[in-house]
């Protein structure tokens, strides 16, 4: 049995016209001999009647438990499965919807942002023996005690990958309102272009650094299980972008992309020992609370201690600072200072080890243009520069123009 998973986002499910395109994509896959598992998101976006944010706006959230809020938020996807299936009447395919329980996505009880801990495929495989197409609700799962949970923003992408792993699907096609993965946000960088191929590693970094095409948790799971993702537009038959490690050799440029974010914050711990155990404790504690750390930096003082800076999303700053405040005595720090309204520009590359001067050339490019780098960090595949919010757009354009103006072959011989 050949299985393909297709995921359709809110813009794809929003109207009868856009849903007509869903049926075209599904029909094409079936004509090519596939059984199709279609994962659907809630219809539309905020102000559309069944979008997740609209459903949340109906209630006083303080009077509902997290478990109850998850039940509310899951309604949009459930409605989508029934609407999409109801309009299949004129297509000669056997189609069935799938319930939350039948999905077989088992999670922890971290409501509103649950983590997948296991999958079962019994119900789905039985149904695939009888039906050509299964319409599945994205964004949701259930605990081992059969309590409904939701997977957080972008959770339908994660649902699609989890089902592909569970069913050993050939690939996952993720349809949205964009044509694929671009070298930068084309709304900011006018000469950004679409990448036909990208590695899991580079795509994961781009997602973590702010690229909106694919949810980072979905890419992480796909990389772990070597699942090929095809990011495509619902509204065209173009190639899009294929995420697979089979195409690493086809990358022509020294970097894979440039991203920017306007909503960062810095948390600085003053007079902390340069103790790796303490750093690991901070990292693990924040990660347990689903707080993403974009980078860290340790600056030694003249005495034995120094200042340790964490780079996070601004919306997480109050929660993160309180968590660190609660463990302040364990960390033995003098004070904790939070700085908001910070922007971030990142460059992602599979080749930092091969071209170590990428980082230095990025610094030179920004400084030469008069952009102040507040702090920076780098790892084996990403360099991040934290700058004033007002400089984020210009910095993205500068770095994109510099690094995509030359191929790898030309770049490797150049130094600052």
Predicted regions and their residues:
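Acidic-aromatic/histidine active-site loop/patch
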Residues: 222
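A conserved regulatory-domain signal marking ACT and ACT-like small-molecule sensing domains
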Residues: 242-416
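Nucleotide/pyrophosphate-binding catalytic subdomain
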Residues: 1-219, 387-388, 407, 413-416
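Terminal amphipathic helices with adjacent charged low-complexity linkers/tails
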Residues: 41-45, 50-52, 231-247
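Internal nucleotide-binding/catalytic subdomain
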Residues: 171-173, 231, 236, 253
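Short phosphate-binding/catalytic loops that engage adenosine nucleotides
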Residues: 34, 93, 227, 291, ...
């Amino acid at each position: 049995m050949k299985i393909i998973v297709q995921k359709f986002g809110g813009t794809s499910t929003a109207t009868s016209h856009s849903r007509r395109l869903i049926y075209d994509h599904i029909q094409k896959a079936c004509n090519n001999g596939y059984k199709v598992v279609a994962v659907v998101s809630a219809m539309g976006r905020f102000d559309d009647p069944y979008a997740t944010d609209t459903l949340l706006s109906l209630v006083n959230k303080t009077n509902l438990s997290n478990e109850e809020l998850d039940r509310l938020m899951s309604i949009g996807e459930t409605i989508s499965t029934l609407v999409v299936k109801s309009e299949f009447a004129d297509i000669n395919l056997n189609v069935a919807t799938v319930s939350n329980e039948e999905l077989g996505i088992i999670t922890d009880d971290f409501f509103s942002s649950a983590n997948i801990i296991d999958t079962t495929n019994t119900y789905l495989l039985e149904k695939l023996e009888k039906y050509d197409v299964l319409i599945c609700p994205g964004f949701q799962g259930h605990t081992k005690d059969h309590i409904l949970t939701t997977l957080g923003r972008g959770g339908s992408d994660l649902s699609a990958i989890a089902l592909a792993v569970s069913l050993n699907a050939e690939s996952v096609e993720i349809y949205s309102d964009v044509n694929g993965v671009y070298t930068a946000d084309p709304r900011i960088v006018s000469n950004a272009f679409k990448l036909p191929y990208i590695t899991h590693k580079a795509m994961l970094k781009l997602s973590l650094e702010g690229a909106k095409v694919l949810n980072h948790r979905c890419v992480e799971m796909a990389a772990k299980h070597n699942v090929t993702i095809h990011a495509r537009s619902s509204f065209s038959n173009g190639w899009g972008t294929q995420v697979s490690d089979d195409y690493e050799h086809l990358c022509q440029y020294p970097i894979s992309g440039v991203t920017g974010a306007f909503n960062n914050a810095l948390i600085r711990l003053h007079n902390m020992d340069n103790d790796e155990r303490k750093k690991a404790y901070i990292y693990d504690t924040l990660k347990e609370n689903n707080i993403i750390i974009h980078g860290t930096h340790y600056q030694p003082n003249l005495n034995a201690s120094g200042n340790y800076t964490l780079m996070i999303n601004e919306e997480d700053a109050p929660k993160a600072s309180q968590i660190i405040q609660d463990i302040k005595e364990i960390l033995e720090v003098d004070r904790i200072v939070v700085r908001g309204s910070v922007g971030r520009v990142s460059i992602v590359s599979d080749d930092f080890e091969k071209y170590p001067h990428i980082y230095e050339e990025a610094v030179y490019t920004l400084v030469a243009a008069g952009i102040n780098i507040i702090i920076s960090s780098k790892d084996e595949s990403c360099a991040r520069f934290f700058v004033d919010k007002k400089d984020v757009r210009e910095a993205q354009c500068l770095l994109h123009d510099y690094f995509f103006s030359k191929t790898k072959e030309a770049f490797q011989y150049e130094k600052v």
